[in-house]
Design a protein with these regions (language model features):
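A conserved FAD-binding loop/helix module that cradles the flavin
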Residues: 295-297, 433-458
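Rossmann-like dinucleotide-binding cores of NAD(P)H-dependent redox enzymes
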Residues: 169-172, 176-207, 211, 298-345, ...
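Feature captures the FAD/FMN-dependent oxidoreductase FAD-binding
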Residues: 141, 146-148, 198-247, 345-357, ...
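N-terminal Rossmann-like FAD-binding beta1-loop-alpha1 element of flavoenzymes
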Residues: 146-171, 294-302
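Ferredoxin-type iron-sulfur electron-transfer modules in oxidoreductases and energy-metabolism complexes
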Residues: 21-40, 61-93, 111-141, 265-266, ...
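Mid-to-C-terminal Rossmann-like scaffold of FAD/NAD(P)H-dependent oxidoreductases
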Residues: 1-32, 328-333, 341-352, 362-364, ...
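Beta1/beta-strand and adjacent pyrophosphate-binding region of the FAD-binding site
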Residues: 142-155, 280-288
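FAD-site-proximal beta/loop scaffold in flavoenzymes
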Residues: 251-282, 366-437
Length: 496
């Protein structure tokens, strides 16, 4: 087989021109055509041991998807990846495939450009949503058991979907008026359009999952009261606790919390925000931080102000825990980056910030994060600004832990055992409330694992754990991996 070492479009994917993105919240990434998707999928060499699947937290059947798309069979491709991923379009857009997951592991990439797995996955999800809606996944007969899930973000949605397929009654309790969690209010529309996430969440609801929005468990209803209504509970409340602002001047007008900023701009729809903007950013914006949220805040501020936006990070670009592609997109849009600087004080006039005094840093020894640690040099510089957006870290949501007294770990994260059960009997936990801020796909994988353990707990299967990725509702041939259609039929496993 001859190896096609280049993608069908400009690497890494087609996207809007930078000039077109000015003040524009439409999706930056442009979709493949049918011909492009089929041609790109045909670049897959169908490895006997697909590493791309192994590195995917959801064990997405990349090989089966590519084989099906290459021959134009989008329905089969959809069902292959829908088997373990209920948010196909969402993850295709927000996963760092090329930076750390499937595309980085693609063997084709060792000889050239890796197969554009995310773009192919996106094409399949868009096809299903816009062209040919596919049937809901099959579910097993009712077990008569009920599970309550606190939190309707990626972890909660993934868990709800799998538990429903196992035949359990499922109710999600969500504090916000919409489902999606951080994926809804924390990821800008130009990266993840709201209609994509809304559609995929609605498909889970269509399976029979009950939804109660506007309910804050621990305040509107107690966790123990909720426990009396269900046979098991899952805590999936995400990461919402913002690092404390202790820099002098943090109380000045114009100094904003980055996570609240993203939530206020996007949670109710960016169109509504643009009609009634609530942030006075001015034309010179500093964004403090070097992670995904800092980059999202900066690129959002660029679109809102069309001014000068600068990310200030205490390490260098090499240490930024962000997909390089997104950094490049920001630079294309005019984003500036300053490194080896950390805020020492916010200085203002008349109660409003006008400049930030920065401590100049240097890199020291490698710390626990695996990166070289920033060390103050003692030197300072001033940077003028009209506003500052601080996005320097978000820990697990600790509200329920404090309300119930359940055991916690570092930074107030929910402590769990090997079965993902908390210190409260029958109460499990998954996602960012356990790990702190992480990837959407990793939160989903934890949600599915928790669903599996809850299923075992309810049916008293014991500790003979079924490997989550060897136990499918649709059988895969050739060991763990699907290599062809089973006469167009899905096979349902008997109840465990």
């Amino acid at each position: 087989m001859s190896l096609n070492t280049q993608r069908v479009s400009k690497f890494p994917f087609p996207k809007r021109d930078a000039k077109e993105r000015e003040g524009n919240f439409e999706e930056v990434q442009l979709p493949y055509t049918l011909e492009e998707a089929m041609a790109e999928a045909s670049r897959c060499v169908t490895c006997g041991n697909p590493v791309c699947i192994d590195v995917c937290p959801l064990q997405l059947d990349v090989r089966g998807m590519c084989e099906a798309v290459a021959r134009g069979d989008m329905a089969t491709a959809y069902h292959r990846i829908r088997e373990t991923n209920a948010l196909i379009g969402t993850t295709s857009r927000c996963c760092p495939q090329l930076d750390s997951l499937c595309e980085k592991a693609c063997v084709v990439g060792s000889q050239g450009e890796p197969v554009a797995i995310g773009m192919i996955q996106r094409f399949v999800s868009d096809w299903e949503r816009n062209v040919s809606r596919q049937p809901d996944p099959k579910t097993l007969k009712s077990t008569g058991m009920s599970v309550g899930i606190v939190g309707g973000g990626p972890a909660g949605l993934a868990a709800a979907e799998l538990l429903k397929r196992y035949g359990h009654s499922v109710t999600i309790y969500e504090e916000l008026p919409v489902l999606g969690g951080t994926a809804w209010y924390g990821i800008p529309d130009y990266h993840l359009p709201k209609d994509v996430l809304q559609y995929e969440a609605s498909r889970i609801v269509d399976m029979g999952v009950r939804i109660k929005t506007g309910v804050r468990v621990g305040k509107d209803i107690g966790l123990y009261d909720l426990g009396s209504d269900h046979d098991a509970l899952l805590i999936a409340t995400g990461a919402k606790d913002v690092s404390k602002f202790d820099t002098p001047g943090s109380d000045l007008k114009g100094v904003y919390d980055g996570y609240r900023f993203l939530e206020d701009v996007f949670a109710g729809g960016v169109e509504k925000y643009l009609e009634h903007p609530t942030y006075d950013l001015g034309k010179r914006v500093l964004v403090i931080g070097g992670g995904d949220s800092a980059l999202d805040c900066a690129r959002t501020a660029l679109r809102l102000t069309r001014g000068e936006v600068t990310i200030v990070y205490r390490r260098t670009e090499v240490e930024m825990p962000v997909d390089e592609i997104l950094i490049e997109e920001g630079k294309e849009e005019g984003l500036k980056l300053k490194f080896l600087l950390a805020p020492k004080a916010y200085v203002g006039e008349g109660g409003r910030v006008t400049k930030t005094t920065m401590t100049v840093m240097k890199l020291g020894e490698v710390d626990a994060s695996g990166r070289r640690s920033p060390v103050p040099t003692g030197e300072t510089i001033d940077m003028g600004c009209d506003s500052v957006i601080v996005a320097i870290g978000r820990g697990p949501n600790t509200f329920l832990q404090k309300a119930t007294g359940m055991a916690t770990g570092p930074k107030g994260a929910v402590a769990i055992d090997e079965n993902r059960m908390t210190s409260l009997q029958g109460v499990f936990a998954a996602g960012d409330v356990v790990t702190g801020e992480s990837l959407v796909v990793k939160a989903m994988a934890q949600g599915r694992e928790a669903a599996q353990r809850i299923h075992e707990y309810l049916l008293k299967i014991g500790k003979e754990h079924i490997s989550l990725y060897d136990y499918y509702f649709t059988r895969r041939t050739s060991g763990r991996y699907y290599t062809g259609m089973l006469d167009g039929k899905e096979e349902t496993l008997p109840p465990a």
